[in-house]
Amino acid sequence: MQYKKPLVVSALAATSLAAYAPKDPWSTLTPSATYKGGITDYSSSFGIAIEAVATSASSVASSKAKRAASQIGDGQVQAATTTAAVSKKSTAAAVSQITDGQVQAAKSTAAAVSQITDGQVQAAKSTAAAVSQITDGQVQAAKSTAAAVSQITDGQVQAAKSTAAAASQISDGQVQATTSTKAAASQITDGQIQASKTTSGASQVSDGQVQATAEVKDANDPVDVVSCNNNSTLSMSLSKGILTDRKGRIGSIVANRQFQFDGPPPQAGAIYAAGWSITPEGNLALGDQDTFYQCLSGDFYNLYDKHIGSQCHEVYLQAIDLIDC
């Protein structure tokens, strides 16, 4: 895959040609290739949930409960590690962001990616929920939700280690799993929790076989999962291929290949700050690449666009609509 380089000449090193310097137009820091059918403008804010590439092929029959990425204060995005859920995916929780804008993944129950204060995106480690049993003995699994990635205060995005919802059993001994939903769950007057925009359930033909209907995605809105929104959830906007978080910071791949939010402008040395899209499958893409890497850092996973070490695993960043719960 070939990439565009900014029109600057640096005396430091040849590799600096692919990095951002403060005087450069950062919006040109984009891969040369684009994702076929990718959407570069999305009408509403959204989060991301972490989905391991190795397990995505089997997610139709047995999906994960996902937790959305969170964001801590520095802008890092974090994501939790997730376990596979018994039922088809339904509502998703978001990634969080920390204060410095970094995007990280924490060890989670299938929760959303968070963002810490510095803008990094991180994901947390997860746990699995136990199977329940109702009075007739049947075992059932509740509709799974995906938690959003969180963001800490520095802008990093992190994901926590996630838990998977367990199958339940009702009183007659049967083990059952419910269908998943895209929309947020509502509660009616008798106390039951219901979810709208459900995917079609499995049907049974005359010979007794159970078949599942293929899911059809809307080409104009490929995002088919929702998650509860909170203060640490990484909430992003996509316009003309540029990602911004709720503080207006720019989603970029920085010099160490980490995905985080800074600025504007992005931090010096940033490699990419544009060229983002949502794929027809509902995943976040950069250029023509829709896979990223979560790499363990203490209790959280930082997110990168390249494999940087032995503690890294290939993942999809699934786009999720965020709702108030």
Curated annotation (Swiss-Prot):
Site described as Covalent attachment to cell wall glycan, located at Q76, Q102, Q120, Q138, Q156, Q174, Q192, Q209
Q: Where is the signal peptide?
A: 1-18
In the record for this protein, the PIR1/2/3 repeats are positioned at: 68-91, 92-109, 110-127, 128-145, 146-163, 164-181, 182-199, 200-217
State a GO cellular component annotated for this protein.
fungal-type cell wall
Which terms under GO biological process does the entry name? Answer: fungal-type cell wall organization
Q: Which UniProt keywords apply?
A: Cell wall, Cell wall biogenesis/degradation, Cleavage on pair of basic residues, Glycoprotein, Repeat, Secreted, Signal
Q: What is the effect of changing V113A?
A: In strain: RAY-3AD
* PANTHER family given in the database record: CELL WALL MANNOPROTEIN CIS3-RELATED
Q: Per the record, what about its domains?
A: The PIR1/2/3 repeats are required for covalent linkage to the cell wall. Their number varies among different strains of S.cerevisiae.
The family annotation for this protein states: Belongs to the PIR protein family.
Q: What's this chain's function?
A: Component of the outer cell wall layer. Required for stability of the cell wall and for optimal growth. Required for resistance against several antifungal and cell wall-perturbing agents.
Q: What is this protein called?
A: Cell wall mannoprotein PIR3
**This protein's encoding gene:** PIR3
